[in-house]
Design a protein with these regions (language model features):
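Conserved acidic
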Residues: 232-236, 240, 350, 354, ...
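Cysteine-centered catalytic environments shared across enzyme families
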Residues: 1-331, 336-341, 345
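Generic, well-ordered alpha-helical scaffold segments in large soluble proteins
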Residues: 86, 243-251, 274-278, 316-319, ...
Length: 645
């Protein structure tokens, strides 16, 4: 993970390098193994390198080619051999940095280059011949990239603090982005968490022209599945296993020890198992970290969810003699105790403060063990372990009634109630108000449709028809149907937010830990979005292809568990411990926070007595979602306005 920055003074002023030097100093926490810059008077590029792969020792950015192209890149390329073969560089590959391959690729394929890349990347390329600047990010946005533009110049940086190092770009929160964050809405459009600073969106190329035009182009097509040449069911099963192992192998490029998150779920288990098998062949060990609840804590008994994932994770760990299983309860940590550090390092408000506690503690423990790479399976729900239930409404809309009936009966035989089968099959096809009425009739309850039931927004904003229309345009309206196919659901999950890159930068700056997610590998995404729905739900078996691909690796107790794990199940006790911190933060809420948030209601929630009994649905929405996210955003606003009162 590296930090890049640059300035183009379109008015011709020759002092760009001076400001780039300021930006590089501000970005030093994200890359201080090597710092360098390229200066051409009105245009300057800077880089602060963090060496995280073996090939990073060959990195000599900024790079230049033919006195035309000048490149700075924050990247880890995961298809190095494939690129080198296509570029005729395979004999030199061992001594080429990833940036060398990227520049050679751009010389060959120009703006078609991003579609040939696999990995995490954000880069800037100055085309001196055509006087254009290109900014590009990978499809999931695992490396952030921000910019600011005015009539005279264009400025970009990996993190907003690089832009805020310049005196004419003041630090201030972006109210509109924060409103969507409070509403749990998906991120769309270029706005960032900071005023007057835009982001290059995931899967996008932003081209800046000499006349000041800023042209965003989506280089990745989310709408059209790729033809991967797979024909039989077995072809897909074998491709799933092989592609996933290739993705994991790419994430193991490191000279340092490696750790992984290991929950009791399917995604992190698949990642950990694949990594352990491959590391064993090298004679290396793997630390697998599992969050477990505080001893004696009041837990949230939510449906059939697994509250302590430690025992399930231990079953997987026990299969591998080279896994060191570490259970983390973060007993010495408290909700909100590192919000200041989070703000300065990651520069966004954490969405889930109760999970932030153990995630941060795992990074601390990895730092103590000198482990620099952390494997995660965050995107697995949308890729390797898609449940496939959305096949049912797809069958209904295409008129495949015999197949729909057969799958419904098979699900019922596996323990699904008739009501659940019917709701899954036709729920996405019904108007939400009618679906809610049916759920209340047969289940006794339905999920809340009132935005204020789960979002800590100021009620005045919720009543604004323009804002409601905005949410519906995002596909987050309160009365919109659910996705009608597995692919539609997967795309909505993969594109929902854009904070993974910020999370990774924050962990790198604070702990020197580089987060890598093979479940979000471009090849894995292309494959899973092309999988026929009958390989996801088949004969009543959800996640059919996952079971076929990984049955010999994942314990049956884990694969066949009825419910999902509930991370942070000890949140009721955690919140009780942190009520003083949360109340203090809300008491410090400034006018901007009071405009966006329902501050009086949040203060009441911070002081509420939730008792000692079973957690109710209302308490879960109020305490875990509204209170914690509201306090996090109030803190972010205060820090972004440089206020400590």
């Amino acid at each position: 993970v590296t930090a890049i920055c640059g300035i183009w003074n379109r008015d011709g002023r020759p002092d760009a390098a001076q400001d780039v030097a300021r930006m590089r100093r501000a970005l030093a926490p994200y890359g201080n193994d090597r710092s360098a810059a390229w200066d051409d008077g009105a245009v300057a590029l800077g880089i602060g390198l963090a060496r995280l792969t073996p090939e990073d020792r060959f990195d000599r950015q900024p790079l230049a080619a033919r006195d035309r192209f000048h490149l700075v890149a924050d990247l880890r390329l995961d298809n190095r051999a494939e690129l080198a073969e296509a570029l005729g560089l395979i004999q030199r590959l061992a001594t080429l940095a990833d940036a060398d391959l990227l520049l050679a690729a751009w010389e060959r394929w120009d703006t078609d280059t991003p579609d040939r890349l696999v990995g995490d990347f954000a880069f800037a390329l100055w085309d001196a011949e055509h006087r254009r600047l290109h900014l590009v990010r990978d499809i999931l946005g695992n490396r952030p990239l921000f910019y600011h533009a005015n009539n005279d110049r264009f400025v970009f940086a990996t993190m907003a603090k690089g832009l805020h190092a310049l005196p004419d770009i003041p630090l201030a929160p972006d109210a509109f982005t924060l409103m969507d964050c409070i509403a749990l809405a998906p991120r769309r459009g270029p706005r960032s968490f900071f005023a007057d600073i835009n982001r290059v969106e995931p899967g996008q190329r932003v081209t800046v022209h000499a006349d000041g035009r800023i042209e965003p182009v989506d280089w990745y097509d989310w709408n059209t599945p790729r033809d991967l040449g797979l024909r039989s069911d077995d072809d897909y099963v074998q491709a799933m296993r092989a592609t996933f192992d290739t993705a994991v192998a790419a994430c193991l490029r490191s000279d340092d020890p490696i750790g992984s998150h290991l929950s009791g779920g399917m995604d992190s288990s698949a990642v950990t198992a694949s990594a352990a098998l491959q590391l064993a062949q090298r004679g290396q060990r793997l630390s697998a970290y599992t969050h477990v609840p505080l001893a004696g804590a009041r837990l949230d008994h939510w449906g059939d969810r697994t509250l302590d994932e430690g025992p399930l994770a231990a079953l997987l760990a026990a299969r591998h003699t080279n896994i060191d299983h570490v259970r983390v309860d973060a007993a010495e940590r408290q909700i909100g105790d590192d919000m200041d550090a989070q703000f300065h390092a990651a520069e966004y408000p954490p969405f889930n403060l109760c999970n932030q506690v153990w995630m941060t503690e795992i990074c601390r423990q990895m730092q103590q063990r000198r482990e620099r790479v952390m494997l995660v399976g965050i995107m697995g729900n949308a890729t390797i372990s898609q449940q496939g239930v959305e096949r049912l409404p797809l069958l209904a809309t295409t008129g495949a009634w015999p197949t729909l009936i057969r799958e419904g009966i098979a699900l019922h035989r596996r323990g699904w109630t008739a009501q659940r089968v019917a709701s899954s099959a036709i729920g996405a096809l019904l108007p939400p108000h009618l679906l809610d009425a049916l759920r209340r009739r047969f289940r006794g309850k339905s999920p809340p449709r009132d935005l204020l039931a789960y979002a800590a927004l100021n009620p005045a904003l919720v009543e604004n028809p323009d804002y409601r229309a905005h949410l519906e345009q995002l596909g987050h309206g309160l009365h919109l149907p659910s996705p009608r196919s597995p692919r539609a659901l997967a795309v909505s999950i993969l594109r929902h937010t854009d904070v993974m890159g910020l999370t990774a930068k924050g962990q790198l700056a604070r702990f020197g830990v580089d987060q890598r997610d093979p479940t979000g590998d471009r090849r894995v995404i292309d494959l899973t979005l092309a999988i026929p729905p009958h390989l996801l739900l088949r004969d009543g078996q959800t996640r059919w292809i996952y079971h076929r691909a990984f049955a010999d690796r994942i314990p049956p107790e884990l694969r066949n568990q009825a419910g999902k794990g509930l991370q942070g199940a000890d949140w009721p006790t955690r919140i009780e411990q942190a009520r003083g911190t949360l109340a203090t933060e809300l008491d410090r809420a400034n006018p901007t926070a009071e405009t966006l948030l329902a501050v009086p209601a949040l203060r009441a929630l911070a002081a509420a007595d939730t008792g000692t009994g079973r957690v109710t649905d209302a308490q879960r929405y109020d305490q875990r979602i509204k209170l914690l996210r509201g306090a996090s955003i109030a803190h972010f606003i205060r820090k972004a306005q440089r206020r400590n009162d």
